[in-house]
Amino acid sequence: GVGGHNQQDVDRGRIFRLAPVGSQYQVPVYDFTNPVGQLEALASPALSVRYLAFQAIQKSGEAAVPALKKFAAENAARNPRLQARALWALGKLPNQGASAVQEALQSDNPDIRIVGIRLARELRLDVASLASLAKDAAPEVRRELALSLRHSRSVDAPAIWAELATQHDGKDRWYLEALGIGADKQWDAYLAAYLAKVNGQWDTVAGRDIVWRSRAKQTPALLAQIITADTTTAAEQPRYLRAIDFLSGPEKEAALQAILK
């Protein structure tokens, strides 16, 4: 059973339905053989029904494209959730991925632009196609773009990350963590791109945040500079000292020795 819940009866289950007195329980019937029925099912609140709709759409292939495009356009203002579902289903069809991504990225709705980023990641498209979003006005879109850079092999990834990093305001902890996740296992290239972009002028509230979260070979020396700086208060020093615990290698040892001098 589930630990702590005292679940002992594993042979039976109970489903409770709360409804007004006299209401009738009706299960909608969908026709998954044609675009109209598929889209009606795609709009269902039931995950199982939406799954069947998605599978039917994929089976229909190119025949489903016109209806999906129309459905997405009709729901752009009326119901963005349905627009997102349609764009995702469209993007998973053969030869439709890149165009579906671009349609999503051009939306005025930041949530739909996020869908575009996630679809691009799902389709393993080059992040270079998302570069324009590095200056997006919505921080949630930029956070999603940062996440999409995680383990990216694109030659454009470090520059995109650096652009995103320069827009950290030193207040958005979630933005900072998105940068950290996005730079995983590629900190050396990403941090170097950031330092070059700011021309070495990294010692700001936001810049210190980025150094604190980073795991590059340069990080220990930068942390040592922060810790020993006259502008760093005694109350702030422990934070940067603890950050060194997450690092390893000879650079870490050299930084500790520099701090103790």
Annotate each PLM feature.
Residues 6-14, 18-261:
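Long, ordered, helix-rich scaffold segments
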